[in-house]
Amino acid sequence: SDTITAWVPLDGSTLDGGAMGYIAGSHRFGVRKFVDIFSGEPEDLLAAPEVRGAEPIFVEVPRGGVAFHHGLTFHVAKPNRTPRTRRVHTMIFFRDGCTRASGGFHPSVDRAGIEAEQAIASSVTPIAWPRASGDLPEPPPPPVERLWGWPPPRRDGVR
């Protein structure tokens, strides 16, 4: 519950292009259900009794902008009805000492091998603040699997 997410649509987001919508105040409902958006069947969280009847507020974010939301905020994206790919980067910030609630799939903590009830603390989830001046964490290791074509070749042909 002590997390904040930065949602960064790299090309901006529009209502036709997959804008994110939020249920106002839903982070206070006490619902702690993680939905795996990467696999499995989609689940309609908007049908939950706590949210029934609430309408998401969709936010268009301009290129270069960031939308922040509490980790327990119910959120949903509109479908992308444009010919462009919706490119988004997400960063999740955890409070120092935060523990993993369950063992369900979550890329932010799975990469570091953090089990349920363990503190979320690793080179992949460094403490951002406070840190002593000059005390920088070691960079995280690269992902095991690389996406096709990434990283792009450098101009000198070296990867």
Question: What is each PLM-predicted segment?
Answer:
Residues 1-4:
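Acidic, His- and aromatic-enriched active-site or binding-groove loops in soluble protein domains
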Residues 6-9, 76:
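Short, hydrophobic/aromatic alpha-helical segments in well-folded domains
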Residues 8-12, 24, 93:
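Short, structured patches in soluble enzyme cores that scaffold and shape functional sites
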Residues 11-15, 19, 31, 44-55, ...:
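Noncatalytic linker/hinge segments flanking ATPase motor cores
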Residues 13-76, 98:
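Double-stranded beta-helix
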Residues 35, 66, 72-159:
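Non-heme Fe(II)/2-oxoglutarate
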